[in-house]
């Protein structure tokens, strides 16, 4: 193990070139530090900053495009929903109109059928009445002839 007291005793200033010697080493270290900062700035920080800026611009442009597309999609959605509502209303009107038309057609056909049936019943009644009258007349004639025959037989 390293003893702390030995480190302290070894770091004591025993002449020139100690721990706090301010000859040319301090400006040299400062120049090295500045050169290292310039090199790091040129080689590392500037490319990183440009990449970060490019990514930031890329993200912002894509975000802008995405928000534009989203707003356009929302507009199209609203437009299509409006058109869908209009089409539904038109379809409902068409359905009600066609139902009315079919109902009117059905009523007309029922009226025509009713008139036809009434006419048919009327002609059948007239025909039956005529046949009844003919049958009654023929029956009346037969009865008359039978009566004449009966009278003729009785008078013999």
Swiss-Prot record:
One Gene Ontology CC term in the entry: proton-transporting ATP synthase complex
Membrane topology label: Single-pass membrane protein
Family named by the database record: Belongs to the ATPase B chain family.
Primary residence: plastid
A Gene Ontology molecular function term of the record: proton-transporting ATP synthase activity, rotational mechanism
Subcellular location: Plastid, Chloroplast thylakoid membrane
UniProt keyword annotations, A-Z: ATP synthesis, CF(0), Chloroplast, Hydrogen ion transport, Ion transport, Membrane, Plastid, Thylakoid, Transmembrane, Transmembrane helix, Transport
Source domain of life: Eukaryota
InterPro entries, alphabetized: ATP_synth_b, ATP_synth_b/b'su_bac/chlpt, ATP_synthase_B_chain
Keyword Oxidoreductase listed: no
Cited HAMAP family: ATP_synth_b_bprime (MF_01398), ATP_synth_bprime (MF_01399)
Residues annotated as transmembrane: 24-44
Function recorded in the entry: F(1)F(0) ATP synthase produces ATP from ADP in the presence of a proton or sodium gradient. F-type ATPases consist of two structural domains, F(1) containing the extramembraneous catalytic core and F(0) containing the membrane proton channel, linked together by a central stalk and a peripheral stalk. During catalysis, ATP synthesis in the catalytic domain of F(1) is coupled via a rotary mechanism of the central stalk subunits to proton translocation. Component of the F(0) channel, it forms part of the peripheral stalk, linking F(1) to F(0). The b'-subunit is a diverged and duplicated form of b found in plants and photosynthetic bacteria.
Record gene name: atpF2
Any further remark recorded for this protein: In plastids the F-type ATPase is also known as CF(1)CF(0).
Pfam families: ATP-synt_B
Complex and partners: F-type ATPases have 2 components, F(1) - the catalytic core - and F(0) - the membrane proton channel. F(1) has five subunits: alpha(3), beta(3), gamma(1), delta(1), epsilon(1). F(0) has four main subunits: a(1), b(1), b'(1) and c(10-14). The alpha and beta chains form an alternating ring which encloses part of the gamma chain. F(1) is attached to F(0) by a central stalk formed by the gamma and epsilon chains, while a peripheral stalk is formed by the delta, b and b' chains.
Protein name: ATP synthase subunit b', chloroplastic
């Amino acid at each position: 193990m390293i003893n702390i007291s030995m480190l302290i005793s070894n770091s004591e200033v025993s002449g020139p070139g100690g721990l706090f010697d301010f000859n040319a080493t301090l400006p040299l270290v400062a120049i090295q530090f500045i050169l290292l900062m310039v090199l790091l700035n040129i080689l590392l920080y500037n490319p990183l900053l440009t990449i970060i800026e490019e990514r930031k611009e890329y993200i912002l442009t894509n975000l802008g495009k995405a928000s534009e597309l989203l707003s356009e999609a929302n507009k199209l959605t609203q437009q299509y929903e409006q058109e869908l509502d209009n089409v539904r209303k038109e379809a409902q009107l068409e359905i009600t109109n066609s139902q009315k038309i079919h109902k009117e057609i059905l009523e007309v056909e029922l009226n025509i059928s009713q008139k036809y049936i009434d006419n048919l019943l009327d002609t059948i009644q007239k025909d039956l009445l005529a046949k009844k009258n003919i049958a009654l007349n023929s029956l009346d004639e037969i009865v008359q002839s039978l009566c004449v025959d009966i009278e003729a037989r009785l008078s013999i």
